């Protein structure tokens, strides 16, 4: 039980009109530490109690007598709690030094499955910074849900089907060079894709030709299938190399093509339940009762099935295969209307588990304020970007620590971590402008700043030869160590908030705050000097390092021991 929960529990025992959960939501952290560590505003009780909030606050303060508080005083309409710093710091440091990286582990999920649809790049197109968001947000959510007791299934729903393959086949047959594609598959396929789109703007017959080749592909034409398979295989080799760079793994690569033979069954169920309506030759599901104006288009007039039909098939397959407690789609916010339709159609089909489906949208990455587009060739490719980030990180590491042994390995962890952290510290639904220089900086709210704080602590612990299991009883009561203790104590709640809101930025911002608080402490405290507090200060340093490393791990970022 953390401090806020303890206060809420104590208050709930003497307040009849509010339960513990409601009290917890009302608790505040005073801006001025002289007003205590936590405050409870009595305004909400005034109407029920028919008393002035000041009087209620005074009565509550008088009734509080827990050992955990140094003192409890009423200041106007607030009950201000001053916590016993020594007792709480001892409790927190004991917990972290005992549990180590398992500190803040929880079993909320009871080992139930969470399916995470993430990354999902399009075959035969380069892996760009635009795909990075879904990849790193999904990967971080996987770590976060595992931390609170769920099992996760990471699905890479590859874009390996659709009209774009018709376009690519036409482009390859017109202008392609087999040897050039074999040598540099993605580069060559991208050039072909950009060229056919540009030419199709002036020559509509290319669009029709592409549709025809896609129809051949759908009908199992040997040449079309062979080219499609080749494009897919070459792309996957490239993608897997990048996923290895990012240290991201998947449990399934079932993409769009996997559901080709599963969509007719969806159409049959919709038909049997009388949900399909005719509209201009197409078959649709009306969703007006869900407040959705546009019907879900299930089958076009030419008999072709659509994106939503495929996603319905995927949802049914995943529920059957994984019996998920939650199914999360980490997909850009421009797809919000699609996922509202998906959930509504599943609800219409009688599947109550549609409530367990969540679209986790995210904002766009721009470059100098401009939207990125593969079709127009205006794209930031991930592979050269990672190489550049690693190179910049290495320059800074060599300047800071020229004697470091494994510079290349550390530079890779810092460069890749910098890109991931910058993405994840941004509130998910906001976009951000891509700025590699800002990402790789060791100053400011960046991944390298947090990693460097961790490495600095490891250096202190090595100098002291500190082993937590041999440390004695420790406690601290100074103001600067207290700021760190409060953050560490809050870590389990931070993880829960990140999971509840599908928001890794909550963890990233926490890591920044903890690193900043420790750096401030380090600047003002002689940690290694012989003193009665030395062991306790080292224990605090150790606990900070454990929590920083774990916070970074939850973001999919490595924490080098030396930098």
From Swiss-Prot:
Its main location: cytoplasm. Pfam families: Arg_tRNA_synt_N, DALR_1, tRNA-synt_1d. GO terms for biological process: arginyl-tRNA aminoacylation. GO terms for molecular function: arginine-tRNA ligase activity; ATP binding. It catalyses: tRNA(Arg) + L-arginine + ATP = L-arginyl-tRNA(Arg) + AMP + diphosphate. One of its GO terms (cellular component) is cytoplasm. It comes from the Bacteria. It is found in: Cytoplasm. Its EC number is 6.1.1.19. Keywords: Aminoacyl-tRNA synthetase, ATP-binding, Cytoplasm, Ligase, Nucleotide-binding, Protein biosynthesis. The keyword Ribosomal protein does not apply. InterPro entries: Arg-tRNA-ligase (IPR001278), Arg-tRNA-synth_N (IPR005148), Arg-tRNA-synth_N_sf (IPR036695), ArgRS_core (IPR035684), DALR_anticod-bd (IPR008909), Rossmann-like_a/b/a_fold (IPR014729), tRNAsynth_Ia_anticodon-bd (IPR009080). It is an enzyme of class 6 (ligase). A motif ('HIGH' region) lies at residues 121-131. Belongs to the class-I aminoacyl-tRNA synthetase family. HAMAP family: Arg_tRNA_synth (MF_00123). Monomer. This is Arginine--tRNA ligase. It comes from Streptococcus pneumoniae (strain 70585).
């Amino acid at each position: 039980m953390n401090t806020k929960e303890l206060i809420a529990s104590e208050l709930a025992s003497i307040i009849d009109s509010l339960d513990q959960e409601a009290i917890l939501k009302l608790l505040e952290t005073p801006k001025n530490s002289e007003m205590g560590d936590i405050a409870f505003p009595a305004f909400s009780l005034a109407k029920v109690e028919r008393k002035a909030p000041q009087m209620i606050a005074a009565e509550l303060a008088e009734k509080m007598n827990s050992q955990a508080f140094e003192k409890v005083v009423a200041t106007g309409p607030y009950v201000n709690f001053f916590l016993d710093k020594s007792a709480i710091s001892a409790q927190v440091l004991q917990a972290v030094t005992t549990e180590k990286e398992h500190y803040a582990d929880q079993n909320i999920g009871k080992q139930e499955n969470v399916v995470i649809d993430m990354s999902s790049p399009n075959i035969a197109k380069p892996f760009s910074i635009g795909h990075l968001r879904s990849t790193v947000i999904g990967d971080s959510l996987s770590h976060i849900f595992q931390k609170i007791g769920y099992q996760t299934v990471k699905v890479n729903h590859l874009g390996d089907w659709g009209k774009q393959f018709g376009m690519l086949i036409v482009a390859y047959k017109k202008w392609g060079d087999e040897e050039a594609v074999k040598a540099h598959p993605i580069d060559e396929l991208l050039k072909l894709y950009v060229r056919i789109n540009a030419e199709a703007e002036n020559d509509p017959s290319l669009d029709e030709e592409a549709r025809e080749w896609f129809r051949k592909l759908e009908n199992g034409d040997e040449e079309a299938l062979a080219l499609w398979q080749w494009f897919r295989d070459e792309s996957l080799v490239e993608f897997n190399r990048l996923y290895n760079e990012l240290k991201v793994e998947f449990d399934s690569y079932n993409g769009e093509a996997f559901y080709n033979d599963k969509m007719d069954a969806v159409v049959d169920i919709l038909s049997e339940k009388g949900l399909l309506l005719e509209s201009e030759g197409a078959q649709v599901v009306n969703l007006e009762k869900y407040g959705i104006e546009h019907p879900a288009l299930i089958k076009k007039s030419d008999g072709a099935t659509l994106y939503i039909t495929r996603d319905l098939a995927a949802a049914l397959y995943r529920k059957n295969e994984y019996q998920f407690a939650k199914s999360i789609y980490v997909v850009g916010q421009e797809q919000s209307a699609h996922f509202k339709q998906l959930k509504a159609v599943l609800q219409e089909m009688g599947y109550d588990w549609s409530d367990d489906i969540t679209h986790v949208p995210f904002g766009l990455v721009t470059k100098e304020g401009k939207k990125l587009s593969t079709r127009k060739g205006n794209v930031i490719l991930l592979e050269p970007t990672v190489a550049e980030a690693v190179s910049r990180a290495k320059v800074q590491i060599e300047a800071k620590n020229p004697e470091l042994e494994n510079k290349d390995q550390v530079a890779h962890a810092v460069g890749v971590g910098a890109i991931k952290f910058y993405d994840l510290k941004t509130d998910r639904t906001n976009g951000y402008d891509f700025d590699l220089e800002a990402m790789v900086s060791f100053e400011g709210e960046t991944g390298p700043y947090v990693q460097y704080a961790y490495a600095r602590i490891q250096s202190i612990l090595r100098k002291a030869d500190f082993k937590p299991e041999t440390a004695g009883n420790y406690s601290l009561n100074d103001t600067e160590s207290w700021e760190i203790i409060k953050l560490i104590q809050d870590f389990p709640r931070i993880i829960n908030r990140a999971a509840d809101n599908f928001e890794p930025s909550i963890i990233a911002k926490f890591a920044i705050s903890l690193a900043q608080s420790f750096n401030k402490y380090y600047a003002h405290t002689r940690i290694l000097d012989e003193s009665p507090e030395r062991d306790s200060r080292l224990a605090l340093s150790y606990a900070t390092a454990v929590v920083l490393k774990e916070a970074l791990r939850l973001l999919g970022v490595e924490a080098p021991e030396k930098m």
